[in-house]
Amino acid sequence: AFTELAARCDAVAVVGLSMGGSLAVWLAEHRPEVAALAVVNPLVTPPDTATTGFIEAMIEGGDEIAPGIGSDIALEGSVESAYPELPLRAALSLFEGVEEVEAKLDSVTCPVLLFTSTQDHVVDPKSSNVLMERVKGPVEQVVLERSYHVATLDYDKDEIEARTVEFLSGVLTAARP
């Protein structure tokens, strides 16, 4: 899809939340023509070995699923459309992929707009610190004090939308020939 879009457009930016942010970063690592990234609470560092070991032990014990992790949202009444269960083998596969993402962060050279929730119960905010330290392109971080992980449905959703539009408009306008 990126290849088709890049063939038709002067510049392409990629936006993602959580695992979508991980995938956006991965794409920028592998496709240097990505003009910009805007990511919200991306997972770019795998969890510690205790966490992965616990999941592996659950699988070895016969468990294939765990309760879902959706709707980490501070705003009362806001609900994320998420799976009610978490497939454990898929989680381990995600963590393996994130190891690759972390290893190649220094290959990201495009401008990055990074939104980080300080009270994220899904992705450790330290993941954002690693991204800021390792990417080679300029990073603008927006700290979200009131929103949890799914910040695009939380208190700061309007700020995320406005800042993303402003950032991408500037970067993509500058990227036009």
Question: Which residues fall in each region the model found?
Answer:
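Alpha/beta-hydrolase fold nucleophile elbow
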Residues: 6-17
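Gly/Ala-rich beta-loop-alpha elbow adjacent to hydrolase catalytic centers
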Residues: 16-20, 24
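Active-site nucleophile loop of the alpha/beta-hydrolase fold
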Residues: 38-48
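Active-site nucleophile elbow and catalytic-triad environment of alpha/beta-hydrolase enzymes
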Residues: 87-104, 110
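Short beta-strand/loop motif that positions the catalytic acidic residue
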Residues: 107-108, 114-116, 120
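Short alpha-helix in the alpha/beta-hydrolase fold that links the catalytic acid
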Residues: 110, 124-133
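Catalytic histidine neighborhood in serine/cysteine hydrolases
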Residues: 129, 133-150
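Catalytic active-site module of serine/aspartate enzymes centered on a nucleophile-bearing elbow/loop
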Residues: 146-177
